[in-house]
Amino acid sequence: MAKKAKNSEKNGPRHSGNFSQESGISGNLWLATVVLIGLFVGFLNYQHIYTLFENDKHFSHLADFEREMAYRTEMGLYYSYYKTIITAPSFLEGVQLITRDTVTEHGHQINTLNRFNLYPEVILAFLYRPFRALAKSANWQVETCWQVNRGDLRPVESCEGIGNPHYFYITGVFVVAGTVATSLFYLGVLVSDSIFGGILSVLCFAFNHGEATRVQWTPPLRESFAFPFIIGHIAILTYIIKYRKSSTAHLLLLISAAVPALLFWQFTQFAFFTQICSIFAAFSMDLVPLDTAKTIIKSHLSAFFISFVMLFGNEMMIAALYFPSIWALATVIYISPMLAGIRLRPLYLLILALIFGSITLGLKVGFSKGLGIEDDAHIFDILRSKFTSFANFHTRLYTCSAEFDFIQYATIEKLSSTLLIPLALLSIGAFSWDFLSKTSLLWRTLENEDSEYGEVIYNLVQLICSTTMAVLIMRLKLFMTPHLCITVALLANSKLLGGDKIAKTVRSSVLVGLVAMLAFRGIPNIRHQLNIKGEYSNPDQEMLFDWIQSNTKQDAVFAGTMPVMANVKLTTLRPIVNHPHYEHVGIRDRTLKVYSMFSKKPVAEVHQTMKKMGVNYFIFQLMNCSNDERRPECVYRGMWDEEDPKNSARTSLCDLWILAANSKDNSRISPFKIVYNPNRNYIVLKI
């Protein structure tokens, strides 16, 4: 393999041109057409998700404080740091505030850039401040404000336009998210050698948009920023494998997509681990030349170290599977020439798999144990809980949420009704038939080193990894659905499904028929999305925040459920002790202590816990103490019976809070005191 690989790029790519060229179209015109269509579908995707977001929230008619409340749970946490930077006296002072933060986890200072992957907020704030200053000096109209009448609620001022910090932020999110369609188009072209394949891929994405992304509902989430770079990285990688590239320029291109993806989302490390596994599969099948493989692994190693430094030495990056797998694949790549004499393919695959697996797991365990890093322990606990009876308080908080549960049958049904899954399976079957007819599974030969479709094998293995992730955790279907769309594009590859034996007109007619079949259910899906109309309003939370602003000190410390705490920090700027970013062992311990307010522990013990944490007020919602007869282990009462069995026979604190709220008698909950209880929703306890 090594002998052939050395000349892989010198001998020229195995396809002509930069992208595959259809007959009758010159190279430059072909490339220009592909680039322009890709940019156009990206713009359409941007417009679509922007429209869906506006329709759902009626965002243009909300006041800024309502927009802040609309960023629920961790979305509000992330946006709060953007707000901190743009309202600071200077950009550098704003960055200093978030790298020496004492508000998010009251009681100690944290570097939120290290912990929360906040580079999107830093970049957008960096762009917003000079943009706003330039607009002001040039007297540009970048924001329009008016008064909105809200019926029984007080009128508010609503401002619209790119000059508004919220609009600047969400526009940045949606511009980045729009590129997903661009990358999918390019990937469709690459795997099908056809513009029609790219169009087919994008149409599948559009027709299954609701099962492919949630950026239109949750813009500030980390995946909204990172996934476009992940899918863009996959497109670049597919191009490099297809054309057997290994130059420094291609190395830098891979790094340029990998670094933002790693900086923007903690889960990217796991996504890239699956990519490493997929590359390993293609390389071990002799489908990726040695020089190309070296370029790929160097890019991952470089991207890792750049990101590690920029995230101030994020410990979880060291302990995650991604870093060990890079070294494992590098070892496989660099020792593979020594194994060139092994012609029996199963033996060759077994040896490489043992090397790859043992190094990955060995380094993973070694780094975690040696450095005492437990930040990612909850991930393996979640996976363990899905296949065994194991459960604890932390796994329940995840697995009781639908998005962290197994994929729902309804999702499979929807993707099947639009023919996405059936056509993807047809594509896989057609490709497998063609590939297996040309490839020896038993013996490695020199001819196999020139086998085509290395990029397709990589993407199919990546699809398997993505599907596995989605089946285990429904939230991760954002990886599976786009890759199913890429796979369907294979049907436009003229070498499959009959190849040259079928006339071009017949093949084109079949593909047009496929599009018509996809559109039959796909277009109603788009209409259904566009018909979703809503208007955000949360008067109870608005009243709560008004009370906090008027009746508590600026340094008063709050605790409560994770979703509410993020909004308390964002809107009232009060210090909090817990928050929704749960991927750190320290915050998991803190949250367990805070949630003891829903346990059956003695009142005095819980009060002492709150005092030690420096909490002044606890925000409580009656729904926090609800029962669920269908899944009793998924409410706080049941979670605490499981977590703290020795106190399971005692009276639940939930019952005491509710009794005190209804009777307006604090004697049963002393030394706690209810200081806010205007309705049957939010209650504030003073510690």
Curated annotation (Swiss-Prot):
Membrane topology annotation: Multi-pass membrane protein
InterPro entries: Dpy-19/Dpy-19-like, Dpy19
GO molecular function, one term: mannosyltransferase activity
GO CC aspect terms: endoplasmic reticulum membrane
Transmembrane intervals: 24-44, 170-190, 191-211, 223-243, 253-273, 276-296, 303-323, 324-344, 347-367, 415-435, 454-474
Entry annotated with the keyword Membrane: yes
Pfam families linked: Dpy19
Localisation per UniProt entry: Endoplasmic reticulum membrane
Keyword Cytoplasm annotated: no
GO BP, sorted A to Z: cell differentiation; nervous system development
Top-level EC class as recorded in UniProt: transferase
EC number: 2.4.1.-
UniProt keyword annotations, A-Z: Developmental protein, Differentiation, Endoplasmic reticulum, Glycosyltransferase, Membrane, Neurogenesis, Transferase, Transmembrane, Transmembrane helix
Main location group: endoplasmic reticulum
Similarity comment: family membership: Belongs to the dpy-19 family.
Function: C-mannosyltransferase that mediates C-mannosylation of tryptophan residues on target proteins such as unc-5 and mig-21. Mediates the attachment of alpha-mannose in C-C linkage to the C2 of the indole ring of tryptophan. C-mannosylation takes place in the endoplasmic reticulum and frequently found in thrombospondin (TSP) type-1 repeats and in the WSXWS motif of type I cytokine receptors.
Protein name in the entry: C-mannosyltransferase dpy-19
Organism name: Caenorhabditis briggsae
Organism phylogeny: Eukaryota, Metazoa, Ecdysozoa, Nematoda, Chromadorea
